[in-house]
């Protein structure tokens, strides 16, 4: 092969490789943005006490670890629906320190963040809690769903 032909083939190869990596990178950014948006929508439904919408973000095979232990989606739906049905209300939800990791295949993700929740209890008492939440999400049939959640108290920050 002559030098011009080698250079032309090399240029085509580099161009194809560049386009491939740009597309892969754009997919990761898009997946990360989709997960961030899902987390915002799910927590907005939580804040609004909109249980049907809130639970729509969870996969049927969902499991979670709360301070009280492990449970599945039917148990969580029953417990949380009862809690809200008794007159308790989430008043405010603020997310911070969101960190999203997308798996190599683009259909798995972990979202971890601090969640500040203000709740008005049925007796009128208002509670403010800060917790650490980590959600594992799978993209199935084109939709992201939370398949696992871990929720625990955030360490108390020291005031200086």
Labelled PLM ranges:
Residues 1-5:
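Positively charged n-region of N-terminal signal peptides that target proteins for export
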Residues 8, 12-60, 94, 98, ...:
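Short, low-complexity N-terminal intrinsically disordered segments enriched in polar/charged residues
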Residues 33-36, 51-107, 112-114, 127-129, ...:
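A solvent-exposed, acidic/Ser-Thr-rich amphipathic alpha-helical stretch
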Residues 108, 130-157:
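Short beta-strand edge/turn micro-motifs at domain boundaries
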Residues 115-121, 137:
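Beta-strand elements of well-folded, non-transmembrane domains
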Residues 122-127, 156-160:
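A short acidic/glycine-rich loop-to-helix N-cap element
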């Amino acid at each position: 092969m002559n030098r011009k032909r080698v250079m032309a083939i090399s240029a085509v190869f580099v161009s194809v490789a560049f386009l491939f990596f740009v597309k892969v990178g754009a997919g990761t950014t898009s997946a990360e943005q989709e997960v961030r948006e899902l987390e915002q929508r799910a927590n907005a439904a939580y804040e609004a006490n909109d249980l049907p919408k809130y639970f729509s973000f969870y996969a049927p095979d969902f499991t979670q670890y709360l301070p009280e232990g492990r449970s599945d989606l039917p148990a969580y739906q029953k417990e949380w629906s009862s809690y809200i049905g008794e007159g308790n209300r989430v008043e405010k939800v603020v997310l911070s320190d969101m960190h999203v990791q997308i798996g190599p295949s683009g259909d798995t993700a972990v979202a971890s963040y601090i969640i500040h929740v203000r709740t008005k209890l049925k007796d009128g008492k208002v509670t403010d809690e800060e917790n650490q939440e980590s959600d594992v999400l799978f993209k199935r049939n084109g939709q992201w769903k939370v398949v696992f959640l871990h929720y625990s108290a955030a360490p108390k920050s020291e005031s200086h």
